[in-house]
Structures are given as structure tokens and as C-alpha cells.
């Protein structure tokens, strides 16, 4: 796939113009080994994911909808909590800052985070009275999602909660190698908090990665890596995407005022635009797609780990793409291990 401004096969700084040079298994192993010694701070909207799985045997006589006979149900971590789960699964230390409600779901979510690993700090998770913990319930049958039911309050938290969140970030920034911000538009990342997190990280010299929601793109000025998905960016801009065009990608990056724009393109992979450079395309390496739930969370987590481990943004994007290719082959919101990523790379995938 050619990219505007560079002919296929032209080499610049060790990269084939338009396509990221494959990252060798040795370098991937090195980054994953370094990940065991890094600390990532995760800030954002915490969610609890519930799953109900069963078989469809008939249509309901009450309405033209399938009747699911439940065979099993389980819960998992979603949103920023899933980012934290992915960080810990790769062996890094993690601190989490966010909010849950003073309810059973909030306690379940906190217990699930606390039970993952000794190297996770959840003292920065605030329990907010009167706020319902966000719960997404997915009903599954025959490897397909039939319906999703959301329980949430998407209103913004007040200034007092915002002050407490920023104080939690200040107390945890020392020693962090990266800050991952996961914005699901559920009230945590109001402008006050978003700007404050970026300012605290910048003062500490810590790179930031933001997975934004459409209506909040403009509040992340100065972020190291902004990582929207294709639909969010297209909706925000109101125009078709042109990830192969250097002029278009650079104009979008400059307009969003981020140092690096990493656009996730689903089955087409990713496109990375760094200031003053050609856009670099990272093809998808997924061999099978079972469930895309939480894949963006995995990418955010692995990007943060890659940067914290000393990788470049381009190297971290390749590492994250390996992880995404693996996680979409798993059921529900899932994580990947260092061994899985390394095996994926050694198997000959780009």
C-alpha cells in the first residue's frame, strides 16, 4: 500500500516508507523483559463487564426476539480497569486512578482489581456515593453477541472529585514510566482532570497515551500519543479518513495538537503519524477474530508498556499490534501474556 510522498521501497531511517519495518523477535523479547521493571499509571473510566452465554433454541412468543438458555455467566474488567489488567498481565507494575460507585458492582470491580496481582495499586480508586458503577452486560450465543445492556451514569463528576483524582495522580507519578488515559466518556475525564493529568505527567517528563472519545478530542492538547479508532475520528472530523496521505495525516495530527497520532483501523491495522514524518502503516496480524471487545484497551496498555520500557512510539505500536492480533482471537474482554506475544512474533508474523 503506497503512501503519498514516498515511493514503495524507499528506505528512510531504517523504515520502508509507508510501512513500518518488522520488529524482530529479539527486540520484542528485550522490550517484554524490560516491561517487568516498569510502572504504568492508568487513569480513566473503570467498568465492570458481565457476560451471559447460552444457546438459542426458539423465538420468544412475547416478541420477535431469540430466547437464550443460559449455560454460564461471568464477569470481567472493562475500560480503564481492562487497561490495568493488560498492564499487569505483561508483568509491569500498575497504579489505577478512577471512580466506582458505592454499590455491589463497585466492590466487585475493586476486588477483581485487587485480586489480580500484588503489583497493582488501587488506592487511587475513589468510591463515589450516589454514582452507579458502570456495568456492561453482554448476552452471547453461538459465538455472537446478541445484545448489550448498559447500566451507567455518563454525567461528569464535580470539581471536588476532580481535585481528589488529580491529587491521586500527583502522589503516583514519581517512578512511573508512562501514563495511560482511557476515556469512555463516563464522567472521570472532565476537562479539569484531563488537562491536569497531562500537565502533571509533562512536569515529571512522563509520556502519555490517550484513548479518547469523540467529544473530548480537543482537551488532550500536548499528549504524547493520541490513539483514536477510525470511527471516532471520522465522526469527529465529519469527513472520510485518508491514512495513506501524509498531508492529511499531518494536518489531523497538528489540528489535534498531539506529538504522535496512532489511528487504529480495525482489520486494516494501524496508521502512525509523527510530527514531520511520513505516515507509517502497520498491517493487522490477526489470524482469527472472535471478539473485538476490549482490543483498544489492550493496545493502550501495550503502547504504554512499550514506551515505559524504552521503545520508540513506532516500536511500541508494533508491539501493541501483536497484542491486539492475539486478544481479538479470545472470547470477551481479555489479556495477553509476554509469552504469547513473543511466540506470535517468532512464528513469523510481521
Mark where each language-model region is:
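A short, aliphatic-rich alpha-helical micro-motif
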Residues: 35, 173-174, 217-221
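Active-site metal-binding loops of divalent metal-dependent hydrolases
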Residues: 45-46, 298
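Conserved post-catalytic alpha-helical subdomain immediately downstream of the catalytic base
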Residues: 259-260, 285-348
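Substrate-binding N-lobe of the ribokinase-like
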Residues: 19-31, 38, 61, 65-135, ...
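Conserved phosphate-binding/catalytic loop of the ribokinase/pfkB sugar-kinase fold
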Residues: 99, 125-131, 138-173
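Conserved phosphate/ATP/ADP-binding segment of small-molecule kinases
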Residues: 186-279
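Structural motif
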Residues: 41-43, 148, 177-180, 209, ...
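Short acidic, glycine-rich surface-loop motifs adjacent to enzyme active sites
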Residues: 173-188
